[in-house]
Amino acid sequence: MQTPGLPEEKPAQGCPFGHGAVASSVATPAADSGDGWHDAQLDFSESMSYGDYLSLGTVLDAQHPLSPDHNEMLFIIQHQTSELWMKLALYELRAALQAVHRDELPPAFKMLARVSRIMEQLVQAWSVLATMTPSEYTAMRPYLGSSSGFQSYQYRQIEFLLGNKNEQMLKPHAHRADVLAEVKASLEAPSFYDEVVRLLARRGFAISAARLERDWTQPTVHDASVEAAWLEVYRNPSQHWELYEMAEELVDLEDAFRQWRFRHVTTVERIIGFKQGTGGTSGATYLRKMLDVVLFPELWHVRTML
């Protein structure tokens, strides 16, 4: 009941993060009440916990060092977490490709931006691995056998999805029929950029038939008709805003990918110099050659033409 002459009292409101508990108007010390702690659920015997949801038992039990060296745990976790980020990158890129195929560009922009941020995360991860010295790596290297990041089938699918196709890169996966089928499907399917070039054609640009009907298993090469289309987009961005935004999202993505490649080669040089890689490649020399790969050639060359 309201007391005459006094302002009306408002009913106490429950904290939106308090699981329905009514907020007290008097501050109380943060202490264990005996029945719980800050209203948090503490009994998960009949409900799903954080660890259950994330399958942490499986994830955190997936590190099996083969050497007695302390630093091998870093090496394993560096690569396992990178594979998890690559899984998400593939998930987003494939969804973005399908969105472009349906002419739904705004969702594709969000997904591409997310992939670029994933690449930035992967770039920063090299700084952690770079804390391993040559002496530390030498102690554990014999235990790696011929295993190498060169054999990462998720990374290979990202390369293929971004247009850097090479049929020879199927061979490292021939011993796993399931993986081989997955990587081969990525090789034979149109790349993300191929789908964007199709989009240009659907938007009325005169893309050559040879470009639209090319062999999807081959790497992306410069095409004059595609560059002419992008030149028109960049000269009149307000008239082709979605295509303009798509172009810039792709440049952001390749820029981040180039940074990842650069940090990869410098980290390898820092740790093993110019020794042969465990997978049989020339190591840093091979990685330096990969720095010259251009994924979206017309988008870079058009800047010179403007």
Swiss-Prot record:
Record EC number: 1.13.11.11
Cofactor note: Binds 1 heme group per subunit.
Chain positions recorded as substrate binding sites: 75-79, 137, 141, 278
Catalytic activity: L-tryptophan + O2 = N-formyl-L-kynurenine
Positions that bind heme: 264
Top EC group: oxidoreductase
Pathway entry: Amino-acid degradation; L-tryptophan degradation via kynurenine pathway; L-kynurenine from L-tryptophan: step 1/2
GO molecular function terms noted in the UniProt entry: heme binding; metal ion binding; tryptophan 2,3-dioxygenase activity
One example of a Gene Ontology biological process annotation: L-tryptophan catabolic process to kynurenine
Highest rank taxon of the organism: Bacteria
Cofactors, names only: heme
InterPro entries: Trp/Indoleamine_2_3_dOase-like (IPR037217), Trp_2-3-dOase_bac (IPR017485), Trp_2_3_dOase (IPR004981)
Keyword terms: Dioxygenase, Heme, Iron, Metal-binding, Oxidoreductase, Tryptophan catabolism
Function summary: Heme-dependent dioxygenase that catalyzes the oxidative cleavage of the L-tryptophan (L-Trp) pyrrole ring and converts L-tryptophan to N-formyl-L-kynurenine. Catalyzes the oxidative cleavage of the indole moiety.
NCBIfam families according to UniProt: trp_2_3_diox
Family (UniProt): Belongs to the tryptophan 2,3-dioxygenase family.
Subunit structure as annotated in this protein's UniProt entry: Homotetramer.
Protein name, per record: Tryptophan 2,3-dioxygenase
Organism: Paraburkholderia phytofirmans (strain DSM 17436 / LMG 22146 / PsJN)
Gene: kynA
